[in-house]
Amino acid sequence: MVGNDWVNSYLEAILAAEPGIANSKPPGTGDSKSSLLLRERGHFSPTRYFVEEVITGFDETDLHRSWVQAAATRSPQERNTRLENLCWRIWNLARQKKQVEGKNAKREAKREREREKARREVTAEMSEDFSEGEKADLPGEIPTPSDNNTKGRMSRISSVDVFENWFAQHKEKKLYIVLISLHGLIRGENMELGRDSDTGGQVKYVVELARALGSMPGVYRVDLLTRQVTAPDVDSSYSEPSEMLNPIDTDIEQENGESSGAYIIRIPFGPKDKYVPKELLWPHIPEFVDRALSHIMQISKVLGEQIGGGQQVWPVSIHGHYADAGDSTALLSGALNVPMVFTGHSLGRDKLEQLLKQGRPKEEINSNYKIWRRIEAEELCLDASEIVITSTRQEVDEQWRLYDGFDPVLERKLRARMKRGVSCLGRFMPRMVVIPPGMEFHHIVPHDVDADGDDENPQTADPPIWSEIMRFFSNPRKPMILALARPDPKKNLVTLVKAFGECRPLRELANLTLIMGNRNDIDELSSTNSSVLLSILKLIDKYDLYGQVAMPKHHQQSDVPEIYRLAAKTKGVFINPAFIEPFGLTLIEAGAHGLPTVATINGGPVDIHRVLDNGLLVDPHDQQAIADALLKLVSDRQLWGRCRQNGLNNIHLFSWPEHCKTYLARIASCKQRHPKWQRVEFENSDSDSPSDSLRDINDISLNLKLSLDGEKSGSNNGVDTNLDAEDRAAERKAEVEKAVSTLAQKSKPTEKFDSKMPTLKRRKNIFVISVDCSATSDLLAVVKTVIDAAGRGSSTGFILSTSMTISETHTALLSGGLKPQDFDAVICSSGSELYFTSSGSEDKTALPYTLDADYHSHIEFRWGGESLRKTLIRWISSVEEKKKTKKGEILVEDESSSTNYCLSFKVKDPALMPPMKELRKLMRNQALRCNAVYCQNGARLNVIPVLASRSQALRYLLVRWGIDLSNMVVFVGDSGDTDYEGLLGGIHKTVILKGLASDLREQPGNRSYPMEDVTPLNSPNITEAKECGRDAIKVALEKLGISLLKP
């Protein structure tokens, strides 16, 4: 290429391909929101592709010269106004691209400044010297290659000598492990990899991981939870509720129980009879969580009867894969109180950074990928996970470091303190563990070739797939360059074909085979996939590659090993030229078959190459480098043989048993916090209320002696506001904490506590009132209306769910003429407290509520306590400093409303409060994990444990007391506290009372994504009542199929 001539040739190609470009608008101007790049879903524009080639491939100076040259043409016959205008526009786009790069640099600098500030604040609070023991410990790092020579045979890690040793040490354990992968089409056999962008390497990974874990000694059962798909356009196997995975071949006989092994469990959720992409699954995650929770509870009970001595066998861990499953796993981990493990596979922030650098507007990115919802889910995974498993160090150092919730420097400091037994002051960071994905090599036999490349076993019949590929070639004996990937722009197959077509020596020495999924008709594929295939076909024609390139339309998953063997037989090379490859499982597969590799320098292949040392790394953007690397390997037989041998020698380090041993060792290091209560059957219980089962435990009762006269003299809304009232509230708080402390010291899971079920267990309908009103009087009116509409009876129960404390709730109920006994349970302090109502007590002045102490132990995971409170106080000072208001304090600590698991603050001016996402970001930067909620019309900020919420409290009732969530009806308003969205989705039914709204709708946002990315507003489980009236509520309940008591 020489300067302007090549630029002009590109521009002429653009004009010939799509004349209408001259009338288009650059991205980000006017009404145009189009991108210059290929979209994974959507219309492919050759024009945009060529423009991007120009912008990324040439200096701005060259582009400017092209415009000057076009504008300087004097002859009317030679002058082309369209070319002149086009040159100017593309030059302008190049300048905009530089501006985007500048913005990206500023954003990265701002992120580093914020992170450095957080580090300084944490270091100041931690006076310990961090210098000792802070060097990074990289657990699970891949061992260095050994010098053993296996003479062309791989070392099989699953052989008897190694596996027996592991089996002897772990055979007594009986673990239950849950894996979750929601999107794509998942089945154990004949996986349709490459069918769409959701059914790729992750599907293969999770299925093989489940199968390998199920074959490990000490693991009794593995459940891989995914979505049940009953759509007519997919195979019926994806609608089967369960599928048992065949175990991997081992020479060890293991004891098999009735429910042991590995299973794919398909949970129905989301649109029925429709297969939807992962971007549209977000609103349906709460439904999946509820149904998955019921399944896990059922299996835990079954396993308890088989191997647990009658007590439930809880999962030792729940492992989420990708952001959508990670979001689900965090909620399930909190509901069950078991350790969470997470694997990102592909991370949203990294994708966002790449797309922003390419000049795509944020609105378009979020519209296509739901990127903000995805990123928040990944941040929640960092909050809730004990272990984050990655495939490479690159993922940790360059991708996870982009998140608010992970700082490699701070993580090492906290780990150093933990090793020395020093308190981390309420700060937590998940452990990043590098464990490469595995393969099972027991059945793989590399193709044996002699020094001349001839087959040592000519009598063996060739597999059918060989002839299917060889029919494309005019000279099938030439070495085969093999690429196996979806026809996706990210896989960079177009550049590969260009490199092959433009390198005559390479074309003379080798053939090219492209395995790009399965297809019948190109026009039936997605626009992106079809565009890539059409581009490749045009390049084949352009370079006259007929007889040199194979593009078979169909292959089975079982054919893939044979395809690798064919490439090795011809002394070929496997190539993965993707722009970015998170890991590169196909590179391991190729190495296992004795096939040297050429791979991208971006991502996981770097780590794989460091271990296998069986090929070359190239810049995927450098077409000439790709051609040179391929030519070098196919032309140098000594290099080819050395790379083949290195791969075979070291491939055992990527075996599934090796992966699982490291995996299980890391899981064993997690602190097990399973529920400690004794589960019993309630069906034959005769109790009528929670108080019947709790009445004899006097230590649990909250003997708070209240002055009823004093309470009645308070404000109209039932909440004390004067100084005397605050003093009384502080005294009451101290008495509550003393009662809870006494409970923790004296109460144990006695038979009387657990021998009878709460009344809620036997309710046919349970109505949960979670309406957040601007005034307490409005809330009381709603409560009375709902109770009146639903009716009272033994089959009907009520739960009040609120942000108020128990004493505030009690005072409000009395002021409205309601009795505590009208409710079976009360959820207080935004979900951090759970009480059952009690009808009898020897002390007539005691509050008639019984604290569920097990709930506190259930939600205390990663609770920062006093360190969190100090950080919040500092944050309040910084907010007030930024606002510099003359009105005085914006936010003050409310000790009277705070409890051991809820830090409460009074908001003096809600309009001056920063967005909730700013507070979350601050906490995550400081490694403090919490759930912050703006409530009570914006007048209060409640900060509670990270996995506590009003919606999670309902799931706790299922886990602790076996209460069916589908029997619940949750009443909410048009809007509410900032935890409002969590109350809408799930298998429970929801009634939205129109006309009831909190003024929080005017507050800074709780999220950066729309409500439709959170909850399915068109769900049949959600309906609206036109007004908060008795008749309107009855009509809404009838729509939901709720039968009410007749008056």
Curated annotation (Swiss-Prot):
Activity is regulated by phosphorylation and moderated by concentration of metabolites and light. Changing P596L: In kns2-1; pollen grain with collapsed exine structure. Disruption phenotype: Loss of nectar secretion accompanied by starch accumulation in nectaries. InterPro entries: Glyco_trans_1 (IPR001296), HAD-like_sf (IPR036412), SPP-like_dom (IPR006380), SPS (IPR044161), SPS_C (IPR035659), SPS_pln (IPR012819), Sucrose_synth_GT-B1 (IPR000368). Residues 101-123 have a biased composition (Basic and acidic residues). The keyword Protease does not apply. GO terms for biological process: nectar secretion; pollen wall assembly; sucrose biosynthetic process. SUPFAM superfamilies: HAD-like, UDP-Glycosyltransferase/glycogen phosphorylase. It catalyses: beta-D-fructose 6-phosphate + UDP-alpha-D-glucose = sucrose 6(F)-phosphate + UDP + H(+). Its EC number is 2.4.1.14. GO terms for molecular function: sucrose-phosphate synthase activity. Disulfide bonds: none annotated. The modification Phosphoserine is found at S127, S131, S159. Coiled coil: none annotated. Residues 101-153, 712-731 are annotated as: Disordered. Pathway: Glycan biosynthesis; sucrose biosynthesis; sucrose from D-fructose 6-phosphate and UDP-alpha-D-glucose: step 1/2. It is an enzyme of class 2 (transferase). Keywords: Glycosyltransferase, Phosphoprotein, Transferase. Expressed in roots, cauline leaves, flower buds, flowers and anthers. Highly expressed in maturing nectaries. Plays a role in photosynthetic sucrose synthesis by catalyzing the rate-limiting step of sucrose biosynthesis from UDP-glucose and fructose- 6-phosphate. Involved in the regulation of carbon partitioning in the leaves of plants. May regulate the synthesis of sucrose and therefore play a major role as a limiting factor in the export of photoassimilates out of the leaf. Plays a role for sucrose availability that is essential for plant growth and fiber elongation. Required for nectar secretion. Homodimer or homotetramer. Belongs to the glycosyltransferase 1 family. This is Probable sucrose-phosphate synthase 2.
